[in-house]
């Protein structure tokens, strides 16, 4: 009985032990689960904290990036203003110069996203100007350059090494010309290679035909063409001209009537001269007919007046029918360039003032303008 009781007790103890063991296992399991959940929760919190930190870092980086971009844009504008302030622009003569002795041509534009580079320099190309705003230091350097421009060139002024530009389109320089006796605006304009209207506008002259001796005029600073050295005439030509002039002096201040009719006519004086050369007078109803009524093949050469023609002493000059009441006029040349401009000549005339028919006007010197319809007859023989 005792044994049975003990056995039963043993069985009960064993069962209780199993129950306690089971409870302990359950407790351990619950504890393990709790610890695991706690650890898992801690790791989750840590991961969440890490995510929050990363999010804060991202937000901070984004704000810094936005700030950096705004600062970069501000630096770009500042840089552009700096470049504009450092560049001195001369609008006149379309020229530019830089304070650091750098020149930028008008056609070059400074871009924001450019890079400084030193391009090898050759005869046709200078250094390139490039700017980089993406450099860490945000500094802009301008290289020395020579801008290529076909209408401009480099200038050195005195001892100062100045690099700039000037336009070839400069205002014409002028000089002062004093009006002299016999001057005209057209002659002055021709002398200084300009126009009458230009001289009028420069000097505020209303009437181009009215200028005064001693008047000061502004004329272009044109280098005057030096006169060509005059060729020394041969002794024979000089002697012949002298002999002709000496003979013509004997005709001066006297009245001549070669044909005995109508007093001292212009035709009479010329016939006296031609008879002295060739032993006969000239034919013609009027003075204007002389070139056409006579055969000059063996005695003279006929010239029609041109702007460059110069008469010689001893030449006959024949005026057209516009003179002498339709009969024309004739005279003997003494000086073919009386005014030094081939505009006037001097001759020995008779009856120029219509006093010959009364024998009241002797042969005398007269200065004439070259007329476009004049004819000159140059004898081969000299007096």
UniProtKB/Swiss-Prot annotation:
Matches recorded under NCBIfam families: YSIRK_signal
Name of the protein in question: Probable cell wall hydrolase LytN
GO cellular component: extracellular region
GO terms assigned for molecular function: hydrolase activity; lytic endotransglycosylase activity
Span of the signal peptide: 1-49
Organism whose genome encodes this protein: Staphylococcus aureus (strain MRSA252)
UniProt keyword terms in alphabetical order: Cell wall biogenesis/degradation, Hydrolase, Secreted, Signal
Keyword Secreted: yes
Subcellular location: Secreted
Keyword Cell wall biogenesis/degradation among UniProt keywords: yes
Enzyme class, broadest EC rank: hydrolase
EC number: 3.-.-.-
GO biological process: one example: cell wall organization
Entry-linked Pfam families: CHAP, LysM
Residue stretches making up the Peptidase C51 domain: 241-378
Residue ranges of domain LysM in the record: 175-219
InterPro entries assigned: CHAP_dom, LysM_dom, LysM_dom_sf, Papain-like_cys_pep_sf, YSIRK_signal_dom
Highest taxon of source: Bacteria
Known function: Probably involved in peptidoglycan hydrolysis.
CDD domains xrefs: LysM
PANTHER family assigned to the protein according to its UniProt record, in alphabetical order: LYSM DOMAIN-CONTAINING GPI-ANCHORED PROTEIN 2, MEMBRANE-BOUND LYTIC MUREIN TRANSGLYCOSYLASE D
Stored PROSITE patterns: CHAP, LYSM
């Amino acid at each position: 009985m005792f044994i049975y009781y003990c056995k039963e007790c043993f069985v009960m103890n064993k069962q209780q032990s199993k129950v306690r063991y089971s409870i302990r296992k359950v407790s351990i399991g619950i504890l393990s689960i709790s610890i695991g959940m706690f650890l898992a929760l801690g790791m989750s919190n840590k991961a969440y904290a890490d995510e929050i930190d990363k999010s804060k870092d991202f937000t901070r980086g984004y704000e810094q990036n936005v700030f950096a971009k705004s600062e970069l844009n501000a630096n770009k504008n500042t840089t552009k203003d700096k470049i504009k302030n450092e560049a001195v622009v001369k609008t006149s003569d379309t020229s530019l110069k830089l304070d650091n002795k750098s020149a930028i041509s008008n056609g070059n534009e400074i871009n924001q996203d450019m890079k400084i580079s030193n391009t090898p320099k050759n005869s046709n190309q200078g250094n390139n100007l490039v700017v980089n705003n993406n450099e860490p230091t945000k500094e802009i350097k301008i290289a020395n350059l020579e801008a290529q421009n076909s209408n401009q060139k480099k200038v050195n002024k005195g001892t100062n090494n100045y690099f700039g530009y000037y336009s070839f389109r400069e205002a014409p320089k002028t000089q002062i010309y004093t009006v002299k006796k016999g001057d005209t605006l057209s002659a002055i304009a021709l002398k200084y290679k300009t126009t009458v209207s230009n001289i009028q506008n420069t000097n505020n002259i209303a009437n181009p035909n009215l200028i005064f001796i001693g008047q000061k005029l502004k004329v272009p600073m044109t280098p005057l063409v030096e006169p060509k050295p005059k060729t020394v005439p041969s002794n024979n030509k000089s002697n012949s001209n002298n002999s002709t002039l000496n003979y013509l002096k004997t005709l001066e201040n006297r009245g001549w009537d070669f044909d005995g009719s109508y007093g001292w006519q212009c035709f009479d004086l010329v016939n006296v001269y031609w008879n002295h050369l060739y032993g006969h007078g000239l034919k013609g109803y009027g003075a204007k007919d002389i070139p056409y009524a006579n055969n000059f093949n063996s005695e003279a050469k006929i010239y029609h007046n041109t702007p460059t023609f110069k008469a010689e002493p001893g030449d006959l000059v024949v005026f057209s029918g516009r003179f002498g009441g339709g009969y024309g006029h004739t005279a003997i040349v003494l000086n073919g360039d009386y005014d030094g401009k081939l505009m006037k000549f001097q001759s020995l005339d008779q009856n120029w003032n219509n006093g010959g028919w009364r024998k009241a006007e002797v042969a005398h010197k007269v200065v004439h303008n070259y007329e476009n319809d004049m004819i000159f007859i140059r004898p081969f023989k000299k007096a």
